[in-house]
Amino acid sequence: MQGLVENIKSSLAKALQVAIAGAVDKGQVNKLEIPEVIIEVPREKGHGDFATNLAMQLAKPAKMAPRKIAEAIIENLDLANTQVERVEIAGPGFINFYLQPSWVHGVIPMIIQEDRNYGRLELGDGQRVQVEFVSANPTGLLHMGNARGAALGDSLASILDFAGYRVSREYYINDAGNQIENFGKSLEVRYLQQLGQDIQLPEEGYHGEDIIDTVKGYINKNGRGLLDADQTTRRKTLAAYALQEKLTHIRNTLLDFGVVYDVWYSEQALHDSGAIQETLDELRQKGFIYEQENALWFKATAFGDEKDEVVVRSNGIPTYFAADIAYHKDKYKRGFDRVIDIWGADHHGHVNRMKGSMEALGHNRDNLQIILMQLVRLLRGGEVVRMSKRTGQFVTLEELVEEVGRDAARYFFVMRSPDSHLEFDLDLAKSQTNDNPVFYIQYAHARICSILRQLQEQGRPLPEIAAINPTVLKEEAELELLRKLADFPSEIAAAAEMMAPHRIARYLHDLAGLFHSFYNSHRVITENEAISEARLVLVQCVRIVLRNALGLLGLTAPEKM
């Protein structure tokens, strides 16, 4: 499906291509190659409904002033089959199109007919995309970085699905390596402490209170039998039990946050299956692995990285990077056209070597897209809430959802671009005022539901779309709402192409603002029946789009507040 705005953009682009070709044929513009014509919706109201910078794009290759090119384009422009009322040249050579006010009324039947599918696109054309996100070590609870990644990854996956991609959500379980060994040692100490032994937890151990609870749970179920086991068996047994408990807890926490994964993928399985060795052998055969100082190195410098990277340590144990290469190789083996990873910004140094390793294995490095997230700071009463995973003092995702609610948490985590540092104001997220963007947006939906409910209580049916005359919606507040509703499919396309859920968050806030402004200055039910019926259908359209957009971010659309 294509939205009203995209249809108009497409028809204007075709008309402009014909116009510039005509201008070249007449000698009004020097011969040149015609680029793709980009049509945009101007940010400023006074700059028209649509605009293009085509004349400025052509100025250099044509060796002409952009305004002169713009004049030639307009002279050759056939707008007979468009709804363009007038065309103006602005600034250095922008071409601004002003449409007949009635153009935007066409969005009303489109929204009513498509309903839950309004905004859905075929942009992805069924391409398979994997989104891997959170993938936290299963050795503790989920912190704010994990929470931001969960909201971002799940929202992005929903947007891509809505845009026509076949999406798989995946969690990579880091259940191998040094952190698991350290986890086993920490569990052993806590186990022995619980059974009366005077033993200290090393400084580098896991100090969170949660592992004490895990050990108590193990003792309640299995007793003291591990006291008689050897150290290796004791640590492995406790680690296996704790990992299962932690993973179950993580799954349930994410489920409560509205995140459901299609695949949970074990790092240990890569070791057990021989996939890591197989991948390293392939890289060696291709000439990208060499031995130095009794270790094996990947030639990351061959792919633009500053230094090569160890993949097998001198003790013969593969590094985390080696497992990561094998894991990503398997993603492509499973048939994904694109792979999207969401990482913390502290992993930025890992990006180029990861892409390089995929290129070394024969894949297009650009098909691996990595989104880096900046840090989250929690604020309460204007003061920073300190977080420390090692000391067990950080605020967990569970605690956050309990304090502010799932909807507020999810919206706040995606309302800024992931490359921006995020200050999460707990007081604002809990407030029931228009300053809280979540309250502001959801209240718009609830307000509309209240209007429609009152109509039903009065025994009046919602007007049929065929029975209304949308052209009576002439007020600027009404036209602004209609233009914003018409923009929704374009916003979906932009959010999908730019991997930017924050665009949908911003769109929601803007749409809610336009609705509240309209509602505060206009009565929906008036003495004029034609206007009343048109406005009732208009607010129903706003309700549909609010609900659709809220759903993409994993938020509810309440009918009462």
From Swiss-Prot:
SMART domains reported for this sequence: Arg_tRNA_synt_N, DALR_1
Family matches, as Pfam families: Arg_tRNA_synt_N, DALR_1, tRNA-synt_1d
Motif ('HIGH' region): 136-146
Superkingdom of source: Bacteria
One example of a Gene Ontology biological process annotation: arginyl-tRNA aminoacylation
Catalytic activity: tRNA(Arg) + L-arginine + ATP = L-arginyl-tRNA(Arg) + AMP + diphosphate
EC number(s) given by UniProt: 6.1.1.19
Keyword annotations from UniProtKB, A to Z: Aminoacyl-tRNA synthetase, ATP-binding, Cytoplasm, Ligase, Nucleotide-binding, Protein biosynthesis
InterPro entries with a match to the protein in the record: aa-tRNA-synth_I_CS (IPR001412), Arg-tRNA-ligase (IPR001278), Arg-tRNA-synth_N (IPR005148), Arg-tRNA-synth_N_sf (IPR036695), ArgRS_core (IPR035684), DALR_anticod-bd (IPR008909), Rossmann-like_a/b/a_fold (IPR014729), tRNAsynth_Ia_anticodon-bd (IPR009080)
A GO cellular-component term linked to this record: cytoplasm
GO molecular function, one term: arginine-tRNA ligase activity
First-listed, main subcellular location of the protein, grouped into a coarse class: cytoplasm
KW Nucleotide-binding (keyword) present: yes
Compartment(s) where it occurs, according to its Swiss-Prot or TrEMBL record: Cytoplasm
Enzyme superclass (EC): ligase
Subunit structure: Monomer.
Recorded family membership: Belongs to the class-I aminoacyl-tRNA synthetase family.
Protein's name according to its UniProt entry: Arginine--tRNA ligase
Organism: Desulforamulus reducens (strain ATCC BAA-1160 / DSM 100696 / MI-1) (Desulfotomaculum reducens)
